[in-house]
Amino acid sequence: MTRATADRCSFCGRQHPQIAQLIEAPGRAAFICNECAERAFDLVKQQRKEAGSEFSLDELPSAKEIKAYLDEFVIGQDEAKKALAVAVVSHYHRLSNPDAGLQKSNILLIGPTGTGKTLLAQSLAEMLEVPFAIADATTLTEAGYVGDDVENVIVRLLQAAEYDVAAAERGIIYVDEIDKIARKSEGTSITRDVSGEGVQQALLKIIEGTVAQVPPQGGRKHPQQELVQVDTRNILFIVGGAFESMSEIARARTNVRAVGFGAEHKGEEKEEVRFLPEDLVKFGLIPEFVGRLPLVVQLQDLDEDALIRILTEPQGAIIKQYQALFGFQGVDLTFSEEALQEVAHRAKERKTGARGLRAVLEKSMTDLLFELPRDDVKEIRFEAEYIDDPLKALESKGLKKSA
């Protein structure tokens, strides 16, 4: 109950008109003013933040529990999920046991577009309830050049941590498209390389561990600006990329025809080539950068069966999302097996992995949703032929297609 009488705040003793509002405690002759309430809220928030900044090993899930959680969001990639789960558990054991002398194991994810690299990293952070930030390596530049300073990645993590520095310092950063900043040759360039080797050198500094001086709101540093210090030694860095020509480099080294991601099949040769640090250097990553990414995890290309499972099984699956949207319009949406197979087939042909699934369905779903709600449409069974002509699904309900 809000009061505007001569009653006083039980905390500061002030009354109207010194304060704008008094709130009465139910059933008691006690009051708190709006200003004291705001201070109390800030204090509670700060105490919760300080309590949450301490990472408790008791709350750390096992590697099997982490993989089981990832299984809910990412289809397939079992070996990659196992490797990630073990690496993450080891990383946070290291944080909880600083005297054990454990080295940080940052992670490199290699795999085609749409195989789940970003989703794996994001799901890990969500399960562990640690701050998480994503950066695109192609937008990063060396200090002094137009574009995002590498340290802006730390700013994003700090923002995700609601400016709790201690929480940010145990967070996870995912840098995508790392293969796009490979230098063009193994020889050292004599000219400035704004988007390649120079960015690798700048990233190397924060991955190795440094006390970054970052502007609290992002952007460029200014002489009069108060900076925030963030120690990056305990931040887990996961970097990812497609590395499309890596299989060729590995084949040249081993004389074995690779299978799986980037492979060409020939005869009965089925040995999978594992990428080595020397392959990454040959590709164009500088040796020092490769050395700070000791765990290399290879993701496999997705076949059509995996794409169908991605359509229907995970939390937030595309089919489930569309069924919810149609449900809001009073329509029960189902898909035939043939329709799912055709969507997966077309997505596979696009060579964009799981990302292609939504692109295949988007227009037909949009066209149908535009016509809803309708009193005579309570259910739709979506067939393969409707992908190119979605309004056919409504013709039996008497809808005439517009010209």
Swiss-Prot record:
Binding site for Zn(2+): 9, 12, 33, 36
GO molecular function: ATP binding; ATP hydrolysis activity; ATP-dependent protein folding chaperone; protein dimerization activity; unfolded protein binding; zinc ion binding
Pfam families cross-referenced by the UniProt entry: AAA_2, ClpB_D2-small, zf-C4_ClpX
One GO BP annotation of this record: cell division
Keywords annotated in UniProt: ATP-binding, Chaperone, Metal-binding, Nucleotide-binding, Zinc
Domain ClpX-type ZB: start-end pairs: 1-52
SUPFAM superfamilies: Glucocorticoid receptor-like (DNA-binding domain), P-loop containing nucleoside triphosphate hydrolases
SMART domains per UniProt: AAA, ClpB_D2-small, zf-C4_ClpX
GO cellular component: HslUV protease complex
Residues noted as binding ATP in the record, renumbered to the chain: 112-119
InterPro entries documented for this protein: AAA+_ATPase, ATP-dep_Clp_protease_ClpX, ATPase_AAA_core, Clp_ATPase_C, Clp_protease_ATP-bd_su_ClpX, ClpX_bact, P-loop_NTPase, Znf_CppX_C4
Function description: ATP-dependent specificity component of the Clp protease. It directs the protease to specific substrates. Can perform chaperone functions in the absence of ClpP.
HAMAP family registered for this protein in UniProt: ClpX (MF_00175)
NCBIfam families named in the record: clpX, PRK05342.1
Quaternary context: Component of the ClpX-ClpP complex. Forms a hexameric ring that, in the presence of ATP, binds to fourteen ClpP subunits assembled into a disk-like structure with a central cavity, resembling the structure of eukaryotic proteasomes.
Family affiliation: Belongs to the ClpX chaperone family.
Protein name, per record: ATP-dependent Clp protease ATP-binding subunit ClpX
